[in-house]
Amino acid sequence: MSTEEEYIKLLDRLYSKLPERVQKVSGQSLPNLIILSIGNNTIIKNFSEYCDRIRREDKLCAKFILKELAAPGNVDENGQLVIQGKFSSASINKIMERFIKTYVQCSTCKSLDTVLIKEKKAWYISCLACGAKTPVKPL
């Protein structure tokens, strides 16, 4: 067997072990958060849709935002995040960017097509585009 045939055989073997590429999250673009200040509350109207788009649970995203803002809040039945206190949309958007960089974006290929996996006490980002598995700090 020639070296070229061996090379082709090894490449085929490699490709058979790689995960299949999955459709990307519509061009890596995310919708803008719709943030309203009503009375002494700040409401993120499209919170559930946003969390669905980045493939993360509402509770997990809410926990991160509320922890960063040091404020109480909850996700209501309409899928809106209601935060007690007035906060600027710029500060909430910065917190969401930090969440995406830490818990959503693949550190290898920068794709947003990832899932968060919890194995025992360790948390990992598993990329659906390149197959990388990156450990992250637990929430």
Swiss-Prot record:
<protein>
    <recommendedName>
        <fullName>Translation initiation factor 2 subunit beta</fullName>
    </recommendedName>
</protein>
<dbReference type="GO" id="GO:0003743">
    <property type="term" value="F:translation initiation factor activity"/>
</dbReference>
<comment type="function">
    <text>eIF-2 functions in the early steps of protein synthesis by forming a ternary complex with GTP and initiator tRNA.</text>
</comment>
<dbReference type="InterPro" id="IPR045196">
    <property type="entry name" value="IF2/IF5"/>
</dbReference>
<comment type="subunit">
    <text>Heterotrimer composed of an alpha, a beta and a gamma chain.</text>
</comment>
<keyword id="KW-0648">Protein biosynthesis</keyword>
<dbReference type="InterPro" id="IPR002735">
    <property type="entry name" value="Transl_init_fac_IF2/IF5_dom"/>
</dbReference>
<dbReference type="InterPro" id="IPR016190">
    <property type="entry name" value="Transl_init_fac_IF2/IF5_Zn-bd"/>
</dbReference>
<keyword id="KW-0396">Initiation factor</keyword>
<comment type="similarity">
    <text>Belongs to the eIF-2-beta/eIF-5 family.</text>
</comment>
<dbReference type="InterPro" id="IPR016189">
    <property type="entry name" value="Transl_init_fac_IF2/IF5_N"/>
</dbReference>
<dbReference type="Pfam" id="PF01873">
    <property type="entry name" value="eIF-5_eIF-2B"/>
</dbReference>
<dbReference type="InterPro" id="IPR004458">
    <property type="entry name" value="TIF2_bsu_arc"/>
</dbReference>
